[in-house]
Amino acid sequence: LDAMLVKVTGKTINQLFAEEGEATFRDRESAQLARLEGSRKTVLSTGGGVVLREQNRSLLHALGYVVNLTATVDELTRRLACAKDRPLLSGETALDERIRQLLVERDPFYADADIRIDTTAKTLEDVVAEILDFYDGKRAGVL
């Protein structure tokens, strides 16, 4: 979803946050997500803040299964230590503390996912296999 916003606006996520603020970014994010309504057979990767709005959570569920990929704070800190495109992770607060704060704030919304997968110490193949097992179980009516 972020990549779609960058393409549509011609600006990076950092530029959008700096020039317009988080509220306007979230408005743009919601509008872009709404454009996908009715889409089928689509895999959509969103930023972690998309779930902050009820309308977005509802639309995500209408589009299909919602998969929440998570990891421990230590693992997320390691993965994001060099990230330059995460405006909410920059600033004075230590990265691990900021990640912890965001997870606490957002966890109730992440819990709304159809499946949550802890990706800590898992390979990409392991995670994909878990998602496919979930999907196959849903299609077979097992889950």
Explain the meaning of each model-derived region.
Residues 48-50, 72-74, 122:
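Short glycine-rich anion-binding loops that position phosphate/pyrophosphate groups of nucleotides
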Residues 15, 62-108:
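A glycine- and Lys/Arg-enriched "phosphate-lid" helix/loop adjacent to the NTP-binding pocket
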Residues 55-58, 78-81, 129-130:
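Short amphipathic alpha-helical segments
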Residues 39, 104-143:
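NTP-dependent small-molecule kinase module
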Residues 31-32, 55-56, 98, 105, ...:
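Short acidic active-site motifs
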Residues 2-61, 85-87, 109:
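ATP-dependent small-molecule kinase phosphotransfer cores
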